[in-house]
Amino acid sequence: MPRYKLVIEYDGAPFRGWQRQADDPTVQAAIETAVTRFSGETARLTCAGRTDAGVHAIHQVAHLDLAKDWRTDTVRDALNAHLRPQPVSILSAEVVPQEFDARHSAIRRHYRYRILNRRSPAALTRAHVWQVPWPLDAELMHRAAQRLLGHHDFSAFRAAECQAKSPMRTLEQLDVTRERMGLFEEIVIATSARSFLHHQVRAMAGTLMLAGCKRLSADDVAEILATGAKHRCGPLAPACGLTFVGVDYL
């Protein structure tokens, strides 16, 4: 029974997240249905990062086992044919050892959060950015972000319904940059860790936004982290601005 590794891109807007649910459309359900339609088999996918409703991905990784030894290009093309017109694309498929697990073999996950920082409304990217119309200082946001790096208790940036056994996480990267293209300006938050708590990236993005408009200092952000003062955090940034951009394996 060969194991296939899939690299997947999707627009999260029409889905209730990755994980299969009883009545709502999800990315996992869409792909598993496509698998059944092309192969006649019932397969269960395991992914590297179970994204929430509205969160996008440009390099999600998942694995599944099939009874038949299909050509990898056939798997890719057949799945894409059965996924249309849903905004999900299988970028590649490859056979991997049975020991490979898309979730548990991962050593690092990468996310990007996009903030459109202008007053004029977004026409083309509104489903993929958080629009903040007041001025933000990306340098102040970056300075505050550096206070969150390292191994810490991230309880202040954790969803109430988070099921992780421990709030301890090691944040390896949290960079904030401003990207300009004419009148189009975005603030991009790039972050990496082995794993994240539920809502951690969005909670950090909302808090860094307050640092960008000088409502919180870098010291304030460090104190929020140290004390777990969730009530002092910024708003939970909307899901639409978040994209899963990659995963590393040994």
From Swiss-Prot:
PANTHER family reported in the protein's UniProt record: PSEUDOURIDYLATE SYNTHASE, TRNA PSEUDOURIDINE SYNTHASE-LIKE 1
MF (Gene Ontology): RNA binding; tRNA pseudouridine(38-40) synthase activity
Protein family per UniProt: Belongs to the tRNA pseudouridine synthase TruA family.
Lineage of source species: Bacteria, Pseudomonadati, Pseudomonadota, Alphaproteobacteria, Hyphomicrobiales
HAMAP family (alphabetical): TruA
Organism: Methylorubrum extorquens (strain CM4 / NCIMB 13688) (Methylobacterium extorquens)
Gene (UniProt): truA
Residues annotated as transmembrane: none
Function of the protein: Formation of pseudouridine at positions 38, 39 and 40 in the anticodon stem and loop of transfer RNAs.
The protein's assembly and partners: Homodimer.
Active site: D52
EC number, UniProt record: 5.4.99.12
Protein name (record): tRNA pseudouridine synthase A
Residues binding substrate, per UniProt: Y111
